Amino acid sequence: MKAFRRLRGGPRGAAPSAYDPAGAFHLGARLSEQGDVDGAKEAYRQAMDSADPEYAPAAAYRLGLLLGRHGDIEGAKEAYRQAVNSGHREHSPVAARNLGHLYKRQARYRQAIAAYQAAIDSGHPDAAPWAMVYLGNLLSGYADPQAARASYQRAVDSGHPEAARQAARHLAGLES
């Protein structure tokens, strides 16, 4: 805890420096856990501003989660877009999947499809199969059962234990 206080500014009240992206990221996580939303946002933005190849995308993803949870959908989308644009092997695909959810909630289906497709194209072992399921859900509600069926089948074929099982259920529902 003392280290977090020191990062938060210590006796002089200085913010975490741009040269300490790991500290800023971890401070953001800690403050978020403690319910200090404004402090967490500030710390995550510090980490994002650092352009650190690991912590900037992680902070962008976490900021997207935080903002979305607190109703700032536009801010969440912007944070997720930063994570997606980073091309980070872990955070980019998951952020793309979450960005798809936000677009879907806003009935911006073309953007949702593109975001889900970006997660699928990443080949990420978790985000891609789930994006296949979510894309199938979107397409089945979008009156394109054939494309939905193809997306569900890809999720089944992925072998992901949960996503494949859920996709198989949806696929069976389309068949009946």
Segments from the language model and where they lie:
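Start-of-helix register in tetratricopeptide repeats
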Residues: 22, 58, 91-94, 127-130, ...
